Amino acid sequence: MTDNQQQRYRFSEAPIWNLNRSYYEEEGLKAWNNDQVPQYITSNPMIATAYAEMIFGLLQDQANKGNNTEPVVIVELGAGAGRLAYHVLVELCKLRDFASITLPPFRYVMTDLAMNNVIAWKEHPALQDFIAEGIVDFAKFDAVNDTELNLVASNITIGAGELQQPLIIVANYFFDGIPQELLYVGDGHIYEADVFVDYPEQADSLKPSEVLDQLSLRYEYRLAPEYEQEDFAYRNVIATYQEQLEDSHILWPSSGLKCLERLNQLTQSGFVLITADKGDNLLDSFKFAEPPELVLHGAFSFTANYHAFVQAYEESGAMVLFPPHHYKNLNVGCFLNVDMPKSYTNTRLAYHRFVERFGPEEFFSLKEWVDRRIDTMGIQQILSFWRLGGYDAEFFIQSARQISSLLPDANDEELADLASGIQIMWSSYYVMEQKYDLALDAGLILFEMDMYEQSKYFLEISINSDEDEIVSTVYYGLAVCCFEMELAEEGLEYTKKLLELEPDNEDAMAIIHSFE
């Protein structure tokens, strides 16, 4: 097809956005299985603790203002697999219960474009206690169009002006993947970069992820004087780009800005936005910027333009917090778009302590370094980093082999701390379809520690969750656990199952003969 036969699109209306939507709608929660779409960096216990601390800070601030009766609503945009929401709720409830002070009630609303995800969250075993307590709810929410929240658990609709408390908005890996415009600054003028899409052959027969992986984009530029009009809503931001940038491409977050405007209409008291993304809040990052490239991960995303949000909201009176240093993997910001933002002292202090000083970005960078050196770490180093990460399941899985090798030389205190850590980890584990079996690794480690009752508990969880892929080692371990616990009949049953997998296993045959 020649250029003049191809359709030309505004960047925000290009077919790539529909492909992105289709990917998430078709894949549902499977999109986050085994990190097809990255989720660990924005949903681990460490970042959840930081968010819970900021939310708890806002609850304290509202209590100090005497606003204790109306609930504070927390809306997570694009809640993905649900892991972040779960960890935030776990930590937030711990803080609430530990503090034992008067606070306003709260409700965490998980939202997504795909209704299948909403249904899956509502049915997830880990969230049932929170549902019963009334502190979590769910809504299908289209960030590009919707103006209200229809909560499916409580059957409540939140419409314009109905919230009296500030709305807390959580947006991780969100602004980088919703429709936006591509602008170009040249000779002091603003251009829109329209796009032509070159599709792979037989695109209609390919999955959205396959089409995205194989298509290519080409751009043509046209003057866009509407951005230079005095009545353009974000005229000052555009003027900054005209004055300080040249030969630069800018992703203009049109949908993101409008989404925040619509969410702001739900409340009488403004909002606090907590957001993390690969996103630039410094203007220097855009100087002489080339056209953006699709970052592919099943779906696609771009580097978010946080700068536009920062300037727009600071000029309207908000306080915006970003770390003073540069980021590599994840930029975490907090927007206090409320009256007298400096009066939100506890919220700001929480950001300082849990993001700015040492936060999710620093933890992830450190974890990448640790991951490459686990086989050199001692038990104390492993325990220390595990605690730092909030007894993270992924780190335990990665370090299980090294832990096993260190057990013979571990002292009683270290073994006790390890066993305690496993229990803490499991108590806040959010089950997802993953390539690893956490219960199996926990059970085998405890077996090596001669903690047979605890080992049996986890090994039985493992075999009950995946009966098609049971290895003989598990039945052997369960049999030994039962015999050590004087559960002879149960131990015999596991021994028989071991023989079904390994008919020539001499130890198992000897046990069977001893019962005859």
Residue positions per predicted region:
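Rossmann-like AdoMet/SAM-dependent catalytic core
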Residues: 243-473, 480
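N-terminal charged/capping segments associated with class I S-adenosyl-L-methionine
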Residues: 1-71, 76, 83-86, 90, ...
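Conserved SAM-binding loop of SAM-dependent methyltransferases across substrates and taxa
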Residues: 81-101
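Conserved SAM-binding motif I beta-strand of class I
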Residues: 99-100, 105-112
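S-adenosyl-L-methionine
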Residues: 118-161, 227, 234
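"A position-specific structural signal for the A-helix of alpha-solenoid helical repeats
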Residues: 441, 477, 484, 510-514
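A short SAM/SAH-binding and catalytic strip from SAM-dependent methyltransferases
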Residues: 153-187, 245-258, 266, 273
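A mobile, often basic/glycine-rich helix-loop segment
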Residues: 171-224, 294-298
